[in-house]
Swiss-Prot record:
The gene is Gsk3a. Phosphorylated by AKT1 at Ser-21: upon insulin-mediated signaling, the activated PKB/AKT1 protein kinase phosphorylates and deactivates GSK3A, resulting in the dephosphorylation and activation of GYS1. Activated by phosphorylation at Tyr-279. SUPFAM superfamilies: Protein kinase-like (PK-like). One of its GO terms (biological process) is negative regulation of D-glucose import. Residues 481-490 have a biased composition (Low complexity). Keywords: Acetylation, ATP-binding, Carbohydrate metabolism, Glycogen metabolism, Kinase, Neurogenesis, Nucleotide-binding, Phosphoprotein, Serine/threonine-protein kinase, Signal transduction inhibitor, Transferase, Wnt signaling pathway. Pfam families: Pkinase. Residues 119-404 form the Protein kinase domain. This is Glycogen synthase kinase-3 alpha. The modification N-acetylserine is found at S2.
Amino acid sequence: MSGGGPSGGGPGGSGRARTSSFAEPGGGGGGGGGGPGGSASGPGGTGGGKASVGAMGGGVGASSSGGGPSGSGGGGSGGPGAGTSFPPPGVKLGRDSGKVTTVVATVGQGPERSQEVAYTDIKVIGNGSFGVVYQARLAETRELVAIKKVLQDKRFKNRELQIMRKLDHCNIVRLRYFFYSSGEKKDELYLNLVLEYVPETVYRVARHFTKAKLITPIIYIKVYMYQLFRSLAYIHSQGVCHRDIKPQNLLVDPDTAVLKLCDFGSAKQLVRGEPNVSYICSRYYRAPELIFGATDYTSSIDVWSAGCVLAELLLGQPIFPGDSGVDQLVEIIKVLGTPTREQIREMNPNYTEFKFPQIKAHPWTKVFKSSKTPPEAIALCSSLLEYTPSSRLSPLEACAHSFFDELRRLGAQLPNDRPLPPLFNFSPGELSIQPSLNAILIPPHLRSPAGPASPLTTSYNPSSQALTEAQTGQDWQPSDATTATLASSS
């Protein structure tokens, strides 16, 4: 969800509130794409914690304890119901607001269930063409949340909501609740997504270091990118392609280094044989097949985008800063060289007869001129930024890459002496995606002490100490299913 900046603009600020040492003042959005298969959205700044899912049931009634208007809920599991406007008229949008707003919301995940949710301290932290993002505090738990408010077409279910309701992973922003509210105009309906709040973005963290003329510390690049690839492995296993991977959509907690993928406004369940629009993804991070106008692309477009993010963190600037769709392709060719006819056919067969200027590939070691760039990082980049979509690494193959070996070492920690965030709390579902990689993905010190170090054989029974070292998170389920999954990979 890019900001509404002028066409051809650079990556804008995130528009988020100042909340930590990494925070910067909010900025404007970036530009839109152009040329063949031009992106409809540029690499603009985005608002705070965002997400989505389809319009299922859950009517809304909203009220304010300070005497604001109240409304009746409506709608059931078949579609959205109308309630009162959000924020209610008369409720001050400011940090000092003592007003408490109560709505009847539907729980974000699990069986459909409605409950009253009260929140306070409402303030705007982001906006764009998609709508508005507010920050609020849940009255009962005092937990900060982000509330993304988008105009809902009553004729259709909201794809973002449908997708968000089915996703449950420690590296994906969690949908807590959702509710509907009416707008100022007659029959105007809004969907409000109540999401967990994460204070920063990779974009702003990287900009913090860039402004200080520094490159983001390599340990942070490893921790952030590993979690991004893990989130992609999960959503791709669910058949979902994000279609807008960029630093602004990667939320991070600067203290714990936990990363959560957000903004599923462009996401889609890809079905083989069904066409998809090519004018998606912010320009700097668009896979070449999208620039060529392909409509039968795969989730490997997310892998290309992730490769662009990795390169940007290593370089301190975007690797392919095109001013338009065509210029974007020129920037890619300047690094990868002119694609062969076979590579063009793999991206879009309609362009095989198009005459491109013959340019040799630029050596990756010269792309990353700094001697401080680890060879493993360069090797990983080159394996992600491939013209042929099927030649790119899968997200889990990226997680298993030697660039991330440091994270799998016993005793690895963050520069602030905190433990690494949860990296190895794999669910049985994750371990079943590419079982042949499990022997690499699970660090040696977390494997069963009775079995050989590699490959894994009959079981995986981590000790309590090993679980502590793994910083176990919500996805870990030490059950018979885990043992069975690992056993099947031998």
